[in-house]
UniProtKB/Swiss-Prot annotation:
It comes from Nitrosococcus oceani (strain ATCC 19707 / BCRC 17464 / JCM 30415 / NCIMB 11848 / C-107). One of its GO terms (biological process) is isopentenyl diphosphate biosynthetic process, methylerythritol 4-phosphate pathway. The keyword Kinase applies. This is 4-diphosphocytidyl-2-C-methyl-D-erythritol kinase. The lineage of its organism: Bacteria, Pseudomonadati, Pseudomonadota, Gammaproteobacteria, Chromatiales. Belongs to the GHMP kinase family. IspE subfamily.
């Protein structure tokens, strides 16, 4: 049995540089993966039924991104096969680590292989974009500079530090953050060279600090050890360390009511490694 990884991502910075006519925010960000994942198991079937055996509590199956990804691939390729899907869920919900998008991307990539539907990675990414702006970066599996609504991607080679990722016990509403009047929406455009020089910030962070004091507390705590930043709209935050031992030492001091993990930054996701092992 092969388990397929759905890795977490970090937004190393997040700027908003404007808005489109349809109201969507124009973003700049940089994605890097870590070696911490959900794990998905797929059992193809001949009956054409898509069965999600690990549904998320309170989420109707037709709204679940894994189910929607499988159905989308099945319909667009006129595939007659079905599948049973199980998920070993590790990534927190509403944490800004991309768990739902990553699960959807892994579903598209894995079923394209198992069902032998023959789509290219770029074709899968186009399908993924229909499910969410973050899905394509997980399909390509490369650390990337992103613009537009997050779908315009340019591969990046970045340092791969150890991270301590802390998730307070709260789910942040992305909608609440993006409609906040105090959110900065006119950042000066960033450059890749600026990112590599350490420039950039997460402009959602001040808004989330005000709305969710527990996230502010976590940021202040983690900043004692290394500069801390929020990923996406939170609630997860992270800090980089030169070595695993330093990250583990900070984790040992973390308040017990938060969730913390130590993970390695990866410019190539574990999903790419898995795909290579299948011979694709």
């Amino acid at each position: 049995m092969l388990l397929w990884p759905a890795p977490a991502k970090l937004n190393l910075f997040l700027h908003i540089i404007g808005r489109r006519e349809d109201g969507y925010h124009l973003l700049q960000t940089a994605f890097q993966f870590v070696d911490y994942c959900d794990w998905l198991e797929f059992r193809p079937s001949a009956d054409g039924r898509i069965e999600h055996l690990s549904p998320l509590p309170g989420v109707p199956v037709e709204h679940d991104l894994v189910y929607r990804a499988a159905l989308l691939l099945q319909q667009r390729t006129a595939c007659s096969q079905g599948v049973e899907v199980r998920i070993r869920k590790h990534l927190p919900m509403g944490g800004g680590l991309g768990g739902g998008s990553s699960d959807a991307a892994t579903t598209l990539v894995a079923l394209n292989h198992l069902w032998e539907t023959g789509l290219s990675i770029s074709q899968l990414a186009q399908l993924g974009l229909e499910l969410g702006a973050d899905v394509p970066v997980f399909i390509y599996g490369r650390a990337a500079w992103a613009e537009g609504v997050g779908e315009q991607l340019q591969p990046l080679e970045l340092p791969e530090p150890w991270y301590l990722i802390v998730t307070p016990a709260v789910q942040v509403s992305t909608r609440e953050v993006f409609i906040a009047p105090e959110l900065t929406r006119d950042c000066k455009p960033m450059t890749i060279s600026g990112l590599l020089a350490g420039e950039g910030e997460n402009v959602c962070e001040p808004v989330v600090r005000g709305l969710y004091p527990v996230v502010a507390d976590a940021l202040d705590w983690l900043s004692q050890f290394s500069p801390a930043r929020m990923t996406g709209t939170g609630s997860s935050i992270f800090a980089a360390f030169d070595g695993k031992s330093q990250a583990l030492a900070a984790l040992a001091c973390m308040p017990s009511h938060w969730q913390g993990i130590v993970a390695k930054g990866c410019n190539y996701s574990l999903l790419l490694d898995c795909l290579e092992k299948t011979g694709c």
